[in-house]
């Protein structure tokens, strides 16, 4: 999928059965592969459709979706099972040579105050080169972005 296709606002794919709906928003996906490794019988990037919601239980699918650090994957339970939980506190994790992963009650607003995104998981650009700012689009790899080693406190 080209960058132009990936970053179209409002493009979303939906994969459903009677128990769960998996939503995928390609503009936020940075292909960490967490879903593929967690549940290959459901998530297979070489298959079409690439999400097969009949490949595992709704509980297993929900667990795998929650491993997506960008929130590109999210789910809705139709079977009365638990919906995505709101994290109790917001955390920000630096990825070496990569984005900031934010988990929590995230609300991103533009300079004019309009809400760009409300989510529980996002990956924010740190390199300054994303064409999907403020979100990471993997441009850090193209430009060779490197983070500095943490300063030693002498201990």
Feature names for model-found ranges:
Residues 77-91, 147-153:
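Polybasic, low-complexity binding patches
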Residues 9-30, 43-63, 78-83, 113-124:
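Ferredoxin-like iron-sulfur electron-transfer modules
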Residues 131-155:
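Short histidine
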Residues 1-19, 150-155:
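Iron-sulfur (Fe-S) cluster-binding modules
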Residues 34-47, 65-79, 133-142:
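Iron-sulfur cluster-binding cysteine motifs and their immediate structural context
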